[in-house]
Amino acid sequence: GWCFGAPKPGGRVWVIDRDAPAIWTGSTWLLGAMGAAPGGAATAAKLIVGDHQIAAGTVSTTALAIPDRAVVIGVTARVSEEIVGAGLTGWRLGVAGAEDRYGSSIGLAVGSIVNGVTGTPVAYYADTPLQLEAQGGAFAGGAVRLAIHFLELTPPV
């Protein structure tokens, strides 16, 4: 049977419906926390996943965004619907001003992947959408599933 008791600071659980770990700080559960300190400071590993339908043009900006204050470890993606377009040879994945930060010359076929590990973790100070940029031509359509892998810092209370 089950035995129930009050959690102690530093106690860890797995939250099934969120598919993530949580740590008890003594006053609240911190979802995704890798570590927490007395006073509420914590570091959490987070992941945001979303699908993106590619619109016609040379650049396709996602609704999925890197959160404000995120320290990004990398961005991964998989082509879920063939990416098509006249003259298209591949695509880049990045953000405005760093169009290939997470990958370039990425395949167009269903199942093509990008594992865009950030060479040095990058901090973002505003919500920042991802950008797909066409190489060799322009997008006419297609779809990708994207995942943003990042750290989130929680200051002490």
Model-identified regions with their sequence ranges:
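Short hydrophobic/aromatic-rich beta-strand motifs
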Residues: 1-24
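Short, surface-exposed secondary-structure edge patches
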Residues: 2-7, 63, 67-69, 121-122
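Acidic glycine-/aspartate-rich tracts in secreted/extracellular proteins
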Residues: 18-20, 27-28, 79-85, 98, ...
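Glycine-rich, low-complexity segments
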Residues: 19-58, 155-157
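C-terminal interaction-tip segments
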Residues: 41-42, 137-157
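Beta-rich globular "head" domains
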Residues: 58-95, 145-151
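Terminal beta-strand-rich extracellular "head" domains
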Residues: 82-123
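Noncatalytic modules at the cell exterior or secretory-pathway interfaces
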Residues: 121-138
